[in-house]
Amino acid sequence: MIKERRTELVEGFRHSVPYINTHRGKTFVIMLGGEAIEHDNFSSIVNDIGLLHSLGIRLVVVYGARPQIDANLAAHHHEPIYHKNTRVTDAKTLELVKQAAGLLQLDITARLSMSLNNTPLQGAHINVVSGNFTIAQPLGVDDGVDYCHSGRIRRIDEDAINRQLDNGAIVLIGPVAVSVTGESFNLTSEEIATQLAVKLKAEKMIGFCSSQGVTNSKGDVISELFPNEAQARVEELEAQGDYNSGTVRFLRGAVKACRSGVRRCHLISYQEDGTLLQELFSREGIGTQIVMESAEQIRRATINDIGGILELIRPLEQQGILVRRSREQLEMEIDKFTIIQRDNMTIACAALYPFVEEKIGEMACVAVHPDYRSSSRGEILLERIAAQARQMGLSKLFVLTTRSIHWFQERGFTPVDIELLPESKKKMYNYQRRSKVLIADLG
């Protein structure tokens, strides 16, 4: 048991090192909704934020206070007012907003300052800085309704924020900002976080919600969404009456941020311990990313990919699942291979060997990394190989397999006799392996 834990620790550390190097010196904007702050797991989140800071990541933390404000209003018997799902902040509400936000600022600052206590980095000082980094303006009047002290961002002093980040501080920004006339305004945390991420040219914007991320109809987490897909999900949730959940608010901001140059926005759970670290320091992550460009890339292999392909297929060759290929053979046939890469690691591959005269192709050397076999990489490769075969004028595709017969049958392949193989392939058939032959029409 102890040996297994040690192995897990070593493997986990090895896998995280490339991400530590990649993230160091980058700017992350972290959006903490009031729901996350009042959850029992918030102390762990704060500790993990402190750990990110110790690794040299430049952090801007934006906090919201929606449930705390609502509780404060209820305690003072002051009815909240909304117009088009936006809070109307009258003078009384503003005082209660400032009170709730001020208490949270003090609490978060204290927690971040102590976040490295009881860790090997105990004694390391974290400087948390707040200030008038954001300048607000009023939302104004809409359909005859005055939003009073509800506002929006007018300007961000990114130079001042960058100076604090350069000095090693964590910048903490709350939902109350002042205008050029000295008035205070109540802003949404998602607007502040989004505008900050864009202005600071942040590498990432990170948000928290009650679930593990965005889920599909089966309840499985969707690991990656493009902005148009995220926008469609927002519209779907709004149609169901969900306008202000953590998921909807973050997705709205993430769509704008990605379209304005922020490379990746991450949505993770505040309820489970360690999600922030799992999302940032593991290849597969744990939540949902909103990205302009996929972390995965499917493309034709080049000579530089041979090492990654060999590393992927060797275990399968040793188990007898794949026919052994030497490096020399792979070098000669590399133009026949298609690979899927994730963060520069080859996680899947397949090859297409055309028999032009017979108008048929062989899909061979199909391999998917064990960590990714529960997803759709196999189907993606099959679709790409089939498309390549059609472009070559081939009308059929065949496979030889000893283990994946049902998988191919489920995808339109039919078992056939060896005699239906192309003549040259028939001569090379290995009767000791007794591979099954399956063929599909490309249509």
UniProtKB/Swiss-Prot annotation:
Stretches assigned to coiled coil: none
Major subcellular location class: cytoplasm
Pfam families: AA_kinase, Acetyltransf_1
Catalysis: reaction(s): L-glutamate + acetyl-CoA = N-acetyl-L-glutamate + CoA + H(+)
Domain of life: Bacteria
Biological processes, Gene Ontology terms: L-arginine biosynthetic process
Acyltransferase as UniProt keyword: yes
Enzyme nomenclature, EC number: 2.3.1.1
Signal peptide stretch: none
Record-linked InterPro entries: AceGlu_kinase-like_sf, Acyl_CoA_acyltransferase, Asp/Glu/Uridylate_kinase, GNAT_dom, NAGS_kin, NH2A_AcTrfase
UniProt xrefs under NCBIfam families: N-Ac-Glu-synth, PRK05279.1
Family from the record: Belongs to the acetyltransferase family. ArgA subfamily.
Protein name: Amino-acid acetyltransferase
Organism name: Salmonella arizonae (strain ATCC BAA-731 / CDC346-86 / RSK2980)
